[in-house]
Amino acid sequence: MRHIRLLPLFIFIALCLLPTNSNASATLPKLDLTVLDSCIAVKRQTNARYEQRLANMKQQLSYAKKDHAKRSRLLYELYQSYSSYQFDSALVYIKKCQEEAEESHDAHQMEKIQLNKALLLAYGGFYNNAEEIIKSVDYNRLPDDLRYDYAIAAYWTYVFWSAFTMDNEFSKSMDSLRTRYLDIAIQYSQKGSANWYYLMGEKSYFMEEDPAKTVTWYLEVLRRERTYGRLMSQAAFAAARSYKMMHNDLKYGQYLILSAKSDLLGPVKE
């Protein structure tokens, strides 16, 4: 399973900011890492508040045993809350969502849950299982609101799978599928939203456009996304990547720190 842990991220930041030679040490800008110290100091309290929020939702769920609509909503909220926090718990709740949808014979919700499960499995590193679900869904029969869910699940599946296989013939086919589903996701994403800007940044990056252009998309995400979590972390990391390509060490370090800060202060564990 592919887990993203905080400690490797901190190590990665430290290594990336180290000068590679004596000349570099004279020019490499100094970065204030104390912001991460303060974030680490409050991480336990942040997690405690988030755990309390989860506990409150579970309590509400226990009072809604016969209210299928409310149960469906709460189960889905719990799945979403766990999706970047604890993979195993997210998997438990996506299965409960599936059972609830089947019990209420809600075909639309069943397909939505299936696609969300594929996305979750992709994030967890189960690429083949995610692809099996995606291929089991008839895209041509989906309404527009589920076509986005389909495309984004497929996109991330092939992004992660391609990165896992590294540079070989299999990776090339994954890259082709990644591009195809990215275009579809952009088509059905809400234009002008933080998520749409992020996807446009991804397209610019994979098309190998000028990083000065690519980074503008990610900066638009950060102007719109004010909640610490996965999207902010990903956008900040992608912005840092662009600045590294532009040889802007100061901005590179600043956005890596922002990415780590978002991981620490948001519900991001895996």
Q: What annotation goes with each model-predicted range?
A:
Residues 8-17:
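Bacterial N-terminal signal peptides
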Residues 1-9:
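Bacterial N-terminal signal peptides that target proteins for export
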Residues 16-270:
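A "functional boundary" signal
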